[in-house]
Amino acid sequence: MNSTDIIANVTKPFVENLTLGETAFYISCGIVGTVFNALVLWIALTYINTEDKPRQIIVINMTVADLLMCIVYMKTRPWLSHFNLWLCHPYYVIIWTCQMCSCLNLVWLNVDKLIYIQFPLHYYQIVNRKRLLWITAATWGGLYAMNIALVTFLKITRGSCLGVSLNPYVYLLSPIFYVVMILTSFSLSALIYCIAHNLTHMEERQRSKLFRRLFFLFSSTLWTFFTCLPYRLLYLFSIFCGETCQINNYYKTATNLFFRLLIVGIMINPVITIWTQRIYRLRLMRMFGRLRENSSTEVLMVSNRRASERPPEHTPLRCDM
């Protein structure tokens, strides 16, 4: 990200002396992102039964990662140069881990849907809450350990957390990870779309429900692809082209522009979750009094409902995520 631009062993933000507009951009994105991510997280933890809907654990992980980014990075970026030096290493560990975790969980979400499409009768035998909790622990723990290892090579060179040095060959793993995860998610989504589109045994009504069920996945994957991948690719290429890219004003402007888009993308992620997933949307409408008392009771009271006692073979497809 902006705070981790490590090229030719030197990390330097795009703009060290932020203007009023840039400060307002970071703070406003941080506040809006915090509010919406906290709202999604509250709804998920309060009203969703993860025994019945284990895939929501993945959504919760993505939301937590984005929430931490909004709080730890966006709201503090204008004052990063004033941080105590002992905060620099934990700061980079947190923001790197959160970004990687968000990308990796998008891959898990695609894998989950691929299993659902390929093995619908055995989905709940393959995917369950316990397994996803183990995957969650392994994902966060593995990425945290990897970034702890990365920051051991980090050196503060300019007296603030804005000026740090890291061997580009060591840090190369990070941008490659982002690009590979995003392309993997996009490829899996394309595969899922092709499989769903070519299902011949489904009636039109069933097919429509299936695609509504997949809408959140496709929206999240495409949004990440267009808001995150351009910056990651430009950054990865800049490591190899070195001084040529650093002195090219057009390249720097494009990189700066796509970085801003990445920040906006993180802020909008929870909005996409609310917009595309029925349970979040209905609960939010209920909170603002726009839903009648007797509407969609089953969806709004998910937490009070037992997990289905029917075997997975007889569990129908649902389109409420």
Curated annotation (Swiss-Prot):
PROSITE patterns: G_PROTEIN_RECEP_F1_2. The chain crosses the membrane at residues 25-45, 56-76, 91-111, 133-153, 176-196, 222-242, 255-275. The keyword tRNA processing does not apply. One of its GO terms (molecular function) is neuropeptide receptor activity. G-protein coupled receptor for the nlp-40 neuropeptide. The activity of this receptor is mediated by G proteins which activate adenylyl cyclase. Plays a role in the defecation motor program, which is a coordinated series of three muscle contractions that occurs every 45 seconds. Specifically, acts in GABAergic neurons, such as AVL and DVB, to control the expulsion step of defecation. Required for fatty acid uptake and metabolism by intestinal cells and therefore regulates the levels of triglycerides in the intestine. Its main location: membrane. It comes from the Eukaryota. Keywords: Cell membrane, Cell projection, Disulfide bond, G-protein coupled receptor, Glycoprotein, Membrane, Receptor, Transducer, Transmembrane, Transmembrane helix. GO terms for cellular component: cilium; plasma membrane. It comes from Caenorhabditis elegans. Disulfide bonds join C88-C161. Residues 46-55, 112-132, 197-221, 276-321 are cytoplasmic. This is G-protein coupled receptor aex-2. Belongs to the G-protein coupled receptor 1 family. One of its GO terms (biological process) is regulation of defecation. The lineage of its organism: Eukaryota, Metazoa, Ecdysozoa, Nematoda, Chromadorea.
